[in-house]
Amino acid sequence: MFQSSRLVALGLCAALVLVGGSIILSGLSPNLSSPMAAAARASSSALVALPGGRMIEVPHMTKDYRDVKVCSRQRKWEIREHMRDPIKMGLMGTKAGMTTYYDDEGIAHPVTVIALEAGNVVTQVKTKETDGYDAVQLAYKETRDRTIPWPERQHLRKHGNVKAMKHLKEFKIADVSEFTPGQQLKAEELFEVGDLVDVSGTSSGKGFQGSIRRWGMKRGPMSHGSKSHRQHGSIGCSATPSRVYKGLKMAGRMGNERKTVKKLPVMMVNDEEKYIVVRGSVPGKKGTIVELRPTKIVGKHC
């Protein structure tokens, strides 16, 4: 009698565990009808501070991203018609920061908000006949006249009578016939949701770092008696070659270098609030000036 009642109790406990596990798994599944997904969609908008202290609210993504997300190995990439040209115009922006928000299915995505401050004005159009190559020069981020050199100020006045701008950057493109000095470029005219972009900028400086953090080298013995826990190993033999090879990975300054992150999908373009949202991280810290270009390599697998 005691043994049978014990078996019944164990059976009830197992049933409760199975029911509880199914409830937990159903709550974790990214279903539109699940309460967790509904709560995620309700709180999916994120507040991001743009340069100057202005706050914007980034809403959740739409299903437009689903059709053009980073392709898998099981299906081919459908190249957009306006992305077939490998050399197209780009823009300059300011990294506002990263945030996490959810799509319509309750799945979280890490995104970076890039603010488009006053600027992105065409200051000069270069052609093969006059300069030997085709390029468009952009000016970005308004500033006071006295903060820029006099020759640069005259250059801006000569080409389109542009206001004083802090940054100038050239973009080599295939066709410059559509651009004129003084023209204001808009993000909606150059990028669409689902486009792949290459983002370039200056990475965060980390100062003087050792070989372990800088190059990921293996540390030394940590046991008692060892005096080289994080020291660099051998850098060369005393007899042959009797010197240190050039380019040997050693301790030194880390970061503060120009980096490019490729093939980031554009998640959102807002010309009214003047910002672009891309999936993933971009070089630099908040306030870093970055350049967005249509990706040069668009293949079957992304």
From Swiss-Prot:
Read off the PROSITE patterns from this record: RIBOSOMAL_L3
Q: Gene3D superfamilies from the entry?
A: 3.30.160.810, Translation factors
Q: Where in the cell is it found?
A: Plastid, Chloroplast
Q: InterPro entries this protein is in? A: Ribosomal_uL3, Ribosomal_uL3_bac/org-type, Ribosomal_uL3_CS, Transl_B-barrel_sf
Q: Does the keyword Transit peptide apply?
A: yes
One Gene Ontology cellular component term attached to this UniProt record is:
ribosome
* Primary location group: plastid
Q: Where is this region: Disordered?
A: 208-239
Looking at the record's lineage, which domain of life comes first?
A: Eukaryota
User: What are the alphabetically sorted keywords of the record?
Assistant: Chloroplast, Plastid, Ribonucleoprotein, Ribosomal protein, RNA-binding, rRNA-binding, Transit peptide
Q: Where is the transit peptide?
A: 1-36
What is its biological role?
One of the primary rRNA binding proteins, it binds directly near the 3'-end of the 23S rRNA, where it nucleates assembly of the 50S subunit.
Subunit-structure text: Part of the 50S ribosomal subunit.
Which named protein is this? Answer: Large ribosomal subunit protein uL3c
